Design a protein with these regions (language model features):
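Hydrophobic transmembrane helix bundles of membrane-integrated enzymes that assemble
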Residues: 11-36, 47-66, 70-215
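Flexible, glycine-rich phosphate/dinucleotide-binding loops
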Residues: 40
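Short, intrinsically disordered terminal tails adjacent to the first/last structured region
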Residues: 1-14
Length: 215
């Protein structure tokens, strides 16, 4: 049984249907990813509501999944470390990452990435389009960069221009993990997406994002 679960969790998608426990995990993952994908952050009421909804889905998922005593102990230990990290840093990120790992039993990794890619793509492009259409606030920062004096950096709906560019990096990570391309297709896709990287850079002027994408 343990061997079967291990193989399944490494990305097997032999099962054609979605079990309830799997659906609740995807809901948990999608809610948190969408919240971050549209630029929500800690301290915002909407982000807190997303955390509550996601945690509810996580609890339901855990209740629907059979666990051995040892697995439950491991989950509790991991969650305890997540809580300690939150208490010491004030950031929810570590605790959320722990939940993502702790709830993975009976959930194929590749399906998780497919759900994540779909959610992040919708969140990323909808945020940018709404910002360009002036439907949501667009933060502008004036910095002295590039030896050109003061320039304007735009966030395109995100909390900070750096967050905009990092969000694009995450989009690329999803794409290249899931894409099954031959050498020629990979070169073309890389060139096009790197062109998108420079387009985002024109707004963000984020060296961090530019370097991450290049690496």
């Amino acid at each position: 049984m343990e061997q079967k679960n291990a193989v399944y969790n490494m990305g097997s998608e032999r099962g054609t249907g979605f079990r309830p426990e799997e659906i609740f995990y995807y809901l948990f993952f999608a809610i948190m990813l969408f919240a971050k994908g549209i630029g929500l952050y800690e301290g915002m009421k909407s982000f807190r509501l997303c955390i509550i909804a996601a945690f509810f889905c996580f609890v339901v998922k855990v209740c629907l999944t059979e666990h051995t005593v040892g697995e439950l102990v491991q989950m509790l230990v991991l969650m305890a470390f997540g809580v300690l990290a939150y208490r010491n840093s004030g950031e929810m990120a570590a605790f959320i990452y722990v939940l993502v790992v702790a709830g993975m039993k009976h959930v194929p990794v590749k399906r998780v990435f497919k759900v994540g890619a779909a959610v992040w793509t919708v969140a990323f492009f909808s945020t940018i389009v709404l910002a360009l259409l002036k439907q949501i606030p667009d933060l502008a920062l004036v910095h002295s960069k590039l030896g050109l004096g003061h320039i304007i950096r735009w966030s395109l709906g995100y909390p900070h221009p750096n967050v905009l560019h990092i969000s694009y990096v995450i989009l690329l990570a999803f794409f290249f993990y899931l894409a099954n391309l031959n050498r020629k297709q990979l070169i073309i896709a890389t060139a096009l997406l790197y062109g998108g990287n420079f387009y985002i850079f024109l707004y963000s002027v984020s060296y961090t994002g530019l370097i991450l994408t290049t690496v």
